């Protein structure tokens, strides 16, 4: 397996690129393992360190049932959302357009920018995000939640992706750092809505496998939750974490704070233990 190219191929990007780590292993590696181990639609696959759900999404694309376990609340949210494929794509897109209009109106009427609390600000890297993109992101986040939509998780996932890659000053090489070139002005809502349109296209394309089973558990793989699944597992495909080398919470810190997965130093310390 050493000759497998370690990057996301364009032809594999649908759903996987809704949100993924810079260090994620590529979907075609999972494809190769499924073939090598003769995994078919009667099989049950486990990824005990599923991260952003590469194994589980790829299994679902192939009609293979799977189970993932993830200790981080943010990445659990990511992988769980990526593994539930909505069928009502018409309302999915229309609701997003309504949210975008509401957010844009609020942004245009603000008398002063919205900010994080002092404690929240202390949790993120200094200069992670500039004032205008942050303010607009907070407005859009609140507009998404105010809509009380069944598609809320998808909308927040799209926001999480672009907090990192379009709105912030973060760079990955592969460790997270701050770019010298700052993004002072960003059309947060337009970028987000474009992402929703891409997600809608993916959901429409893959709807024939929307019912394929995929369950993502929040927990520590060392104390297995949902033990009733254990006897069903035919194959394990995973990439174990390297806790002595990587602080995974640092990589996802900004979006975790903005979306509320981490809002105190105590919670941050807890996440760093995994």
Report each predicted region and the residues it spans.
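Residue-level marker of regulatory loop/turn positions in helix-turn-helix DNA-binding domains and
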Residues: 22, 129, 229
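Glycine-rich, phosphate-binding/catalytic loops in enzymes
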Residues: 62, 84-85, 228, 234, ...
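SAM-dependent nucleic-acid methyltransferase catalytic core
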Residues: 134-238, 243-251
């Amino acid at each position: 397996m050493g000759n497998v190219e370690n990057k996301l191929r364009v032809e594999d990007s649908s759903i996987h690129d809704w949100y993924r780590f810079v260090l994620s292993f590529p979907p075609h590696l999972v494809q190769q393992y499924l073939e090598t181990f003769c995994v078919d639609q009667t099989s049950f696959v486990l990824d005990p360190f599923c991260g952003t759900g590469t194994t589980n999404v790829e299994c679902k694309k192939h009609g293979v049932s799977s189970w993932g376990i993830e200790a981080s609340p943010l990445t659990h949210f990511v992988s769980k959302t990526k593994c539930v494929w909505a069928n009502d794509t018409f309302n999915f897109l229309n609701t997003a357009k309504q949210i975008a209009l509401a957010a844009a109106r609020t942004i245009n009427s603000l008398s002063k920018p919205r900010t994080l609390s002092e404690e929240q600000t202390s949790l993120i890297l200094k200069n992670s995000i500039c004032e205008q993109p942050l303010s607009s992101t907070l407005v859009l986040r609140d507009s998404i939640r105010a809509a009380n939509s069944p598609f809320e998780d998808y909308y927040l996932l799209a926001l999480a992706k672009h907090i990192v890659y379009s709105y912030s000053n973060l760079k990955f090489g592969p460790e997270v750092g701050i770019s010298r070139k700052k993004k002072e002005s960003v059309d947060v809502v337009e970028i987000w809505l474009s992402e929703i349109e891409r997600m809608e296209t993916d959901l429409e394309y893959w709807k024939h496998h929307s019912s394929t089973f995929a369950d993502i558990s929040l927990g520590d793989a060392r104390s297995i939750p949902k033990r009733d699944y254990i006897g069903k597992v035919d194959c394990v495909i995973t990439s174990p974490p390297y806790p002595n080398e990587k602080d995974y919470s640092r990589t996802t810190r900004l979006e975790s704070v903005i979306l509320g997965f981490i809002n105190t130093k105590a919670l941050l310390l807890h996440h760093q233990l995994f």
